[in-house]
Amino acid sequence: MNTWIQLTLSTVLAVVLLSFMVWFIRVRPRQPQLEAVWNSDCELITTADIDDTKITFRNVRDFFWRTTKDRDESWIDEVTVDTEEIKDIWFIVDHFHSLHGLAHTYLTFEFNDGTCLSFSFEARRRVKHRYHPWDGLWRNYELYLLVALESDMTGLRTNARGNKDYMFRGITPPEKDKHMLIRMAQKANQLSEKPEWYHSLLTTCNTSIVRMVNRVTPGRVPFLWRNFLPGYTPRAALKLGLIEDWGGLETTLEKARIDLIAQQWNGEGSYSEMLRRHLPSSTVEKEQ
């Protein structure tokens, strides 16, 4: 073995050992917190009261975003929905980076009365802290389940940030949509009492959704590399029958794109209704 190879192996070994030391000495002892000076967009934690088919969510975000810095901040004290009135579950893929695989995913529950509630697993950030994937590997962010009106959560991405966004109608077996919403409510309550760490690979927006889906329907989403690169999830979701097929992958992507439509919106009427006017009607008949 020549000297250069020996030096390279020694350097790699030293870096690995140093990383383990930092993890066990500095990172592992850290405990997730509920109390801190949080950024205003993740300041409050949502909790839920479950009463038969009715679920009341408390502290639902309802910001109006003109830009990422210019916004009207508001939190709704209570939003009550009925699991029997779920119309659709939507899967949103938000491409926030030039690298296609780097994206944010979340779910929106649409109800028959027009209410659209979005659920997003995110990194909870302290004041003056910005998100970075590297920091997320080292227990720098708590896991945060943001519950917000669709006009807030999706409007932020399509209009204020100008990201490329896709919105797919989910396919759920009978009763599973109700169970999924209940799971979301239960998870919100769990995080309000016992905080958890966010992790840039293992506990992200998409892996958290996958985990929730598989708890409702065990084995529904297999272990896939795309789970860790959410930008590539539409292909897998279509193949697995998790989202509606609107004419093959490319056509489905074309029809599901919402950012260009949203950016032409004049602000009149309902943001959610505006989006759905441009999305295909359901191609799957729901079983009762």
Model-derived regions, located:
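Alpha-helical transmembrane signal-anchor/signal-peptide segments
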Residues: 30-47
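A structural motif
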Residues: 148-188
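N-terminal Sec-pathway targeting helices
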Residues: 1-18
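Glycine-rich catalytic cores of cysteine/serine-nucleophile enzymes that process amide/ester linkages
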Residues: 55, 60, 65-165
